[in-house]
Protein backbone atom coordinates (compact mmCIF):
# COMPACT_ATOMS: atom_id res chain seq x y z
CA UNK A 1 0.00 0.00 0.00
CA UNK A 2 1.47 3.27 -1.09
CA UNK A 3 1.45 6.25 1.21
CA UNK A 4 0.63 9.53 -0.36
CA UNK A 5 2.52 12.50 1.06
CA UNK A 6 1.17 15.94 0.38
CA UNK A 7 3.72 18.65 -0.20
CA UNK A 8 2.98 21.90 1.62
CA UNK A 9 4.79 24.98 0.46
CA UNK A 10 6.38 26.79 3.39
CA UNK A 11 5.55 30.49 3.24
CA UNK A 12 8.41 33.01 3.31
CA UNK A 13 8.95 36.71 2.73
CA UNK A 14 9.90 37.71 -0.73
CA UNK A 15 12.64 40.29 -1.06
CA UNK A 16 10.11 43.00 -1.84
CA UNK A 17 7.98 42.10 1.19
CA UNK A 18 11.06 42.14 3.42
CA UNK A 19 12.05 45.57 2.14
CA UNK A 20 8.52 46.84 2.80
CA UNK A 21 8.64 45.57 6.41
CA UNK A 22 12.04 47.19 6.95
CA UNK A 23 10.74 50.46 5.52
CA UNK A 24 7.71 50.39 7.84
CA UNK A 25 9.95 49.75 10.87
CA UNK A 26 12.20 52.63 9.84
CA UNK A 27 9.21 54.98 9.50
CA UNK A 28 7.86 53.97 12.92
CA UNK A 29 11.30 54.46 14.47
CA UNK A 30 11.54 57.88 12.86
CA UNK A 31 8.20 58.82 14.40
CA UNK A 32 8.85 57.37 17.86
CA UNK A 33 12.48 58.31 18.53
CA UNK A 34 11.93 62.11 18.49
CA UNK A 35 8.98 61.67 20.84
CA UNK A 36 11.08 59.53 23.19
CA UNK A 37 13.93 62.04 23.05
CA UNK A 38 11.52 64.86 23.84
CA UNK A 39 10.08 62.92 26.78
CA UNK A 40 13.58 62.21 28.08
CA UNK A 41 14.55 65.89 27.82
CA UNK A 42 11.39 66.88 29.69
CA UNK A 43 12.12 64.38 32.46
CA UNK A 44 15.68 65.66 32.76
CA UNK A 45 14.46 69.24 32.97
CA UNK A 46 12.07 68.30 35.78
CA UNK A 47 14.90 66.52 37.61
CA UNK A 48 17.06 69.62 37.20
CA UNK A 49 14.26 71.79 38.60
CA UNK A 50 13.96 69.54 41.64
CA UNK A 51 17.72 69.63 42.18
CA UNK A 52 17.77 73.42 41.99
CA UNK A 53 14.88 73.63 44.44
CA UNK A 54 17.03 71.69 46.90
CA UNK A 55 19.95 74.02 46.17
CA UNK A 56 17.76 77.09 46.70
CA UNK A 57 16.35 75.67 49.93
CA UNK A 58 19.88 74.92 51.14
CA UNK A 59 20.90 78.53 50.52
CA UNK A 60 17.89 79.68 52.54
CA UNK A 61 18.64 77.31 55.43
CA UNK A 62 22.25 78.49 55.46
CA UNK A 63 21.10 82.12 55.51
CA UNK A 64 18.74 81.46 58.42
CA UNK A 65 21.70 80.19 60.42
CA UNK A 66 24.05 83.00 59.37
CA UNK A 67 22.28 86.31 59.89
CA UNK A 68 20.25 86.12 56.66
CA UNK A 69 23.46 85.99 54.59
CA UNK A 70 24.24 83.51 51.85
CA UNK A 71 27.69 81.80 51.84
CA UNK A 72 29.07 84.34 49.35
CA UNK A 73 28.68 87.04 52.03
CA UNK A 74 30.07 84.99 54.94
CA UNK A 75 33.79 84.59 55.64
CA UNK A 76 35.40 81.17 55.38
CA UNK A 77 36.34 81.65 59.04
CA UNK A 78 32.61 81.56 59.78
CA UNK A 79 31.83 78.67 57.46
CA UNK A 80 31.11 80.73 54.35
CA UNK A 81 32.90 81.37 51.07
CA UNK A 82 33.22 85.14 50.64
CA UNK A 83 36.98 84.95 50.05
CA UNK A 84 36.27 83.02 46.85
CA UNK A 85 34.14 85.78 45.33
CA UNK A 86 36.29 87.62 42.74
CA UNK A 87 36.74 91.36 43.10
CA UNK A 88 35.85 91.95 39.45
CA UNK A 89 34.05 90.14 36.67
CA UNK A 90 35.72 88.43 33.71
CA UNK A 91 38.19 86.61 35.94
CA UNK A 92 38.75 82.91 36.47
CA UNK A 93 36.98 81.22 39.38
CA UNK A 94 38.61 77.80 39.89
CA UNK A 95 36.95 77.52 43.31
CA UNK A 96 33.44 78.46 42.23
CA UNK A 97 32.25 75.06 43.49
CA UNK A 98 33.23 76.07 47.02
CA UNK A 99 30.13 78.25 47.43
CA UNK A 100 28.09 75.05 47.18
CA UNK A 101 30.54 72.85 49.04
CA UNK A 102 30.20 74.89 52.25
CA UNK A 103 26.51 73.94 52.25
CA UNK A 104 27.24 70.21 52.30
CA UNK A 105 25.23 69.80 55.50
CA UNK A 106 22.21 71.47 53.96
CA UNK A 107 22.52 69.76 50.56
CA UNK A 108 23.12 66.29 52.06
CA UNK A 109 24.36 64.82 48.75
CA UNK A 110 26.47 66.31 45.93
CA UNK A 111 24.20 64.65 43.39
CA UNK A 112 21.76 67.56 43.66
CA UNK A 113 24.29 70.01 42.21
CA UNK A 114 24.35 68.15 38.90
CA UNK A 115 21.88 68.62 36.05
CA UNK A 116 21.18 65.36 34.15
CA UNK A 117 21.06 67.33 30.89
CA UNK A 118 24.57 68.75 31.38
CA UNK A 119 26.89 66.90 29.01
CA UNK A 120 29.97 68.85 30.04
CA UNK A 121 30.12 68.13 33.76
CA UNK A 122 30.69 64.94 35.73
CA UNK A 123 28.08 63.73 38.23
CA UNK A 124 29.12 62.17 41.51
CA UNK A 125 28.61 58.44 41.02
CA UNK A 126 27.22 56.47 43.93
CA UNK A 127 29.88 53.84 43.28
CA UNK A 128 32.59 56.26 44.34
CA UNK A 129 31.52 56.09 47.94
CA UNK A 130 28.49 55.28 50.01
CA UNK A 131 29.46 57.66 52.78
CA UNK A 132 28.24 61.22 53.03
CA UNK A 133 31.55 62.91 53.82
CA UNK A 134 33.67 61.03 51.31
CA UNK A 135 31.37 61.89 48.42
CA UNK A 136 31.92 65.57 49.08
CA UNK A 137 35.69 65.01 49.28
CA UNK A 138 35.53 63.78 45.68
CA UNK A 139 34.39 67.29 44.78
CA UNK A 140 36.91 69.12 46.97
CA UNK A 141 40.17 67.20 46.91
CA UNK A 142 42.02 66.91 43.57
CA UNK A 143 44.84 65.06 45.35
CA UNK A 144 42.60 62.02 45.69
CA UNK A 145 42.71 61.50 41.94
CA UNK A 146 38.96 61.95 41.58
CA UNK A 147 38.56 65.52 42.74
CA UNK A 148 36.04 67.16 40.42
CA UNK A 149 35.96 70.73 41.77
CA UNK A 150 33.98 72.84 39.28
CA UNK A 151 33.45 69.78 37.08
CA UNK A 152 31.22 68.27 39.74
CA UNK A 153 28.65 71.06 39.58
CA UNK A 154 26.23 72.09 36.85
CA UNK A 155 25.07 75.26 38.53
CA UNK A 156 26.14 78.88 38.60
CA UNK A 157 26.30 81.03 41.72
CA UNK A 158 24.94 84.58 41.94
CA UNK A 159 27.63 86.41 43.89
CA UNK A 160 25.49 89.37 44.92
CA UNK A 161 22.31 87.46 45.76
CA UNK A 162 20.64 88.57 48.96
CA UNK A 163 17.78 87.25 51.02
CA UNK A 164 16.13 90.69 50.87
CA UNK A 165 16.15 90.77 47.03
CA UNK A 166 13.89 87.88 45.98
CA UNK A 167 14.27 88.60 42.25
CA UNK A 168 18.06 88.28 42.14
CA UNK A 169 19.75 85.28 40.51
CA UNK A 170 20.92 82.89 43.21
CA UNK A 171 21.82 79.84 41.15
CA UNK A 172 20.89 78.15 37.90
CA UNK A 173 21.96 76.16 34.86
CA UNK A 174 25.50 76.78 33.69
CA UNK A 175 24.54 77.13 30.01
CA UNK A 176 23.88 80.78 30.76
CA UNK A 177 25.81 83.39 28.78
CA UNK A 178 26.21 87.15 28.49
CA UNK A 179 26.65 86.78 24.74
CA UNK A 180 23.32 86.94 22.91
CA UNK A 181 24.66 84.79 20.08
CA UNK A 182 25.59 81.85 22.34
CA UNK A 183 25.33 78.61 20.37
CA UNK A 184 26.24 75.00 21.04
CA UNK A 185 28.71 73.93 23.68
CA UNK A 186 29.86 75.60 26.89
CA UNK A 187 28.83 79.22 27.45
CA UNK A 188 30.36 81.89 25.22
CA UNK A 189 31.16 84.91 27.34
CA UNK A 190 32.15 88.45 26.50
CA UNK A 191 35.81 89.17 27.41
CA UNK A 192 36.25 85.66 28.81
CA UNK A 193 39.84 84.66 29.68
CA UNK A 194 41.42 81.68 27.97
CA UNK A 195 41.90 79.61 31.13
CA UNK A 196 39.49 76.76 31.67
CA UNK A 197 38.97 77.43 35.36
CA UNK A 198 35.47 78.82 35.24
CA UNK A 199 34.59 82.47 34.80
CA UNK A 200 32.81 85.27 36.59
CA UNK A 201 30.54 87.30 34.34
CA UNK A 202 28.26 90.30 34.56
CA UNK A 203 24.89 89.43 33.07
CA UNK A 204 23.93 93.09 33.37
CA UNK A 205 20.50 94.66 33.02
CA UNK A 206 20.63 96.69 29.80
CA UNK A 207 20.54 94.07 27.06
CA UNK A 208 21.44 94.90 23.45
CA UNK A 209 21.22 93.05 20.17
CA UNK A 210 24.83 91.84 20.41
CA UNK A 211 25.56 91.75 24.13
CA UNK A 212 22.98 90.31 26.45
CA UNK A 213 22.17 87.47 28.77
CA UNK A 214 20.75 84.27 27.39
CA UNK A 215 21.19 80.52 27.20
CA UNK A 216 23.19 78.32 24.86
CA UNK A 217 21.41 75.61 22.89
CA UNK A 218 22.78 72.83 25.06
CA UNK A 219 21.34 71.50 28.30
CA UNK A 220 17.71 72.66 27.99
CA UNK A 221 17.36 73.72 24.36
CA UNK A 222 18.11 77.45 24.60
CA UNK A 223 16.43 77.79 27.99
CA UNK A 224 17.38 77.18 31.60
CA UNK A 225 16.27 76.81 35.19
CA UNK A 226 17.08 79.63 37.59
CA UNK A 227 16.86 79.67 41.40
CA UNK A 228 16.00 83.14 42.68
CA UNK A 229 16.82 84.91 45.91
CA UNK A 230 13.57 83.78 47.51
CA UNK A 231 14.50 80.13 46.88
CA UNK A 232 11.96 79.57 44.11
CA UNK A 233 12.95 77.95 40.81
CA UNK A 234 11.61 79.08 37.45
CA UNK A 235 12.18 78.03 33.86
CA UNK A 236 13.45 80.87 31.71
CA UNK A 237 13.81 81.58 28.03
CA UNK A 238 16.32 84.22 26.99
CA UNK A 239 13.57 86.86 26.78
CA UNK A 240 12.24 86.02 30.25
CA UNK A 241 15.73 85.96 31.72
CA UNK A 242 16.48 89.45 30.45
CA UNK A 243 13.23 90.77 31.88
CA UNK A 244 14.07 89.12 35.20
CA UNK A 245 17.52 90.74 35.27
CA UNK A 246 16.05 94.17 34.58
CA UNK A 247 13.79 93.79 37.61
CA UNK A 248 16.32 92.10 39.89
CA UNK A 249 17.43 95.19 41.81
CA UNK A 250 21.08 94.51 40.89
CA UNK A 251 22.73 96.48 38.11
CA UNK A 252 25.54 93.95 37.61
CA UNK A 253 24.03 90.51 38.20
CA UNK A 254 27.48 88.96 38.53
CA UNK A 255 27.56 85.17 38.48
CA UNK A 256 30.25 82.52 38.71
CA UNK A 257 30.14 79.80 36.07
CA UNK A 258 32.12 76.61 36.57
CA UNK A 259 34.35 75.35 33.78
Regions found by a protein language model. Give the residues of each.
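N-terminal leader/signal peptides at the extreme start of proteins
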Residues: 1-15
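Beta-strand-loop-alpha-helix segment that lines the small-molecule cofactor/substrate pocket
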Residues: 37-46
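Short, well-structured segments within or immediately adjacent to enzyme catalytic domains
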Residues: 49-259
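Alpha-helical hydrophobic helix detector
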Residues: 19-38
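Active-site helix adjacent to the Tyr-X3-Lys
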Residues: 30, 42, 50-53
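Exposed loop/turn and edge beta-strand positions of beta-sandwich/beta-sheet ligand-binding modules
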Residues: 9, 18, 42
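Generic anion/oxyanion-binding catalytic loop in active/binding sites
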Residues: 25, 44, 220
Amino acid sequence: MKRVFSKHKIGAFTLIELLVVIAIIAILAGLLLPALAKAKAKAQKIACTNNLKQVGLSFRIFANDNGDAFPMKVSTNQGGSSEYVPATANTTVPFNFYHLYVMSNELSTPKVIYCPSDNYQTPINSTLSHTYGTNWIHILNPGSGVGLRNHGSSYIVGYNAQDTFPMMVLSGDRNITNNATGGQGPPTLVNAPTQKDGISANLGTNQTATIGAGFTKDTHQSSGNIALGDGSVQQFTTARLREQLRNSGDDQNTVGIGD
